[in-house]
Amino acid sequence: MNIDIANQLRAAKKATTDLNLIQSDTRTIILKTLAANLEKHIENIIQENQKDLSLMLEQDPRYDRLLLNKERILSLANDVRKVADLPNPLGVNLLEKSMPNGLSIKKITVPLGVIAVIYESRPNVTIDIFSLCFKSGNVCILKGGKEAHFTNSYLLLLIKNTLKNFNINTDIVCLLPPERALMTQLLNATGLVDLCIPRGSQNLINFVRDNAKIPVIETGAGIVHTYFDKSGDLGKGKKIINNAKTRRVSVCNALDTLIIHADRLKDLPELVETLSQKNVIIYADQDAYQVLDKNYPKQLLIKAKPQDFGHEFLDYKLAIKTVPNIKAAIDHIQQFSSHHSEAVIAEDESAIDKFLTEVDAAAVYANASTSFTDGGEFGLGAEIGISTQKVHARGPMGLDALTSYKWVIRGTGQIRN
């Protein structure tokens, strides 16, 4: 292991003791101070962010994820305050019982320990991760991408300066160099890192999963479907599809494939009408293509190929699949889904119940945009990631997902026969 990384990781592991001694009220005050410092240094943050943006083409899908402006920084500070005001997740009594032999047994929440997060493009993640880890008593190791190096470095400086003002050990957070070559060393840090959470492309997630010797929670990759049922309301459908696809195309909860019941193909031109105003390219299957051929701009309409389905576009692109019934829609989703977010637009309650019950995803929706799959929107304050697996957490991961538990047993001298 590279000596510099080894030293950082050992210092981080040692700092868990100091972090556990910080009272909950103090953590809250420190986070609110950090939020104020973010607002105070908006211009400096933007200046550093511009250095990163200047090295990337505006047409790059990552550009929007990398961008920090005044509005986004204020929103970020507000998210930190929301996390600060959340109930303390530590020391929560999950179970308590008195045994016949007189033993008192409790099951209480505790921090996971040292959490490493590997992420790409989004510098706001740096603040989100720290605030959630700090509130939940976890040391955090940050491994951002080189494309956000200037922004991440400045945000880390703000965090550490805030901690110094309260005489807090700054080793409770560290930012590793952005070089990808160091990732394998981090993933092999058994005994020093308790959990790794990759946030980014499917390639990044696959690399981490396949090479890690430390526990991993997969997050981020979203191949998202919305099924417009035979009973779907056209007005709701237009709004939901437009929002899910175009609100922010670069996020993991953005719509990738629209599945439509064959009996509603006549409504397809109206369903996607607003998408053309934002130059959304549609990859339509044969039935959908025939309907849209004279009702959607030709330069934006392409005949779908097999590889267009099961693809996370992260761009102004949408695949359309026609199905004869809801079973075929669910089968298509189960084949191509990344188990992130899936939605149905329907008025038939039996169709809604079938979809919500049978579709295997972290978040399933009826008559709402998948854009809501987000820690803040779920009332979690912020999220460290959106887990697409079932153990140890699923969906948006807030404070509770960053805790484990331990058993506390009190006795009066009991021994076991």
Curated annotation (Swiss-Prot):
What does it catalyze? L-glutamate 5-semialdehyde + phosphate + NADP(+) = L-glutamyl 5-phosphate + NADPH + H(+)
GO molecular function annotations of the record: glutamate-5-semialdehyde dehydrogenase activity; NADP binding
List its EC numbers. 1.2.1.41
Per the UniProt entry, what are the Gene Ontology biological process annotations, in alphabetical order? L-proline biosynthetic process
Annotated pathway: Amino-acid biosynthesis; L-proline biosynthesis; L-glutamate 5-semialdehyde from L-glutamate: step 2/2
HAMAP family reported for this sequence: ProA (MF_00412)
Question: Is the keyword Cytoplasm in the record?
Answer: yes
Q: What is the enzyme's class at the highest EC level?
A: oxidoreductase
Species per Swiss-Prot/TrEMBL record: Legionella pneumophila (strain Corby)
Official protein name in the record: Gamma-glutamyl phosphate reductase
Transmembrane regions listed in the UniProt entry: none
Q: What cellular-component terms does GO give this entry?
A: cytoplasm
Instruction: Give the record's keywords alphabetically.
Output: Amino-acid biosynthesis, Cytoplasm, NADP, Oxidoreductase, Proline biosynthesis
Q: Which PANTHER family match?
A: DELTA-1-PYRROLINE-5-CARBOXYLATE SYNTHASE, GLUTAMATE SEMIALDEHYDE DEHYDROGENASE
UniProt similarity note: Belongs to the gamma-glutamyl phosphate reductase family.
Q: Report the protein's function.
A: Catalyzes the NADPH-dependent reduction of L-glutamate 5-phosphate into L-glutamate 5-semialdehyde and phosphate. The product spontaneously undergoes cyclization to form 1-pyrroline-5-carboxylate.
Q: Which InterPro entries match?
A: Ald_DH/histidinol_DH (IPR016161), Ald_DH_C (IPR016163), Ald_DH_N (IPR016162), G-glutamylP_reductase_CS (IPR020593), Glu-5-SA_DH (IPR012134), GPR_dom (IPR000965)
Q: Does the keyword Kinase apply?
A: no
Q: Give the UniProt subcellular location, in the record's own words.
A: Cytoplasm
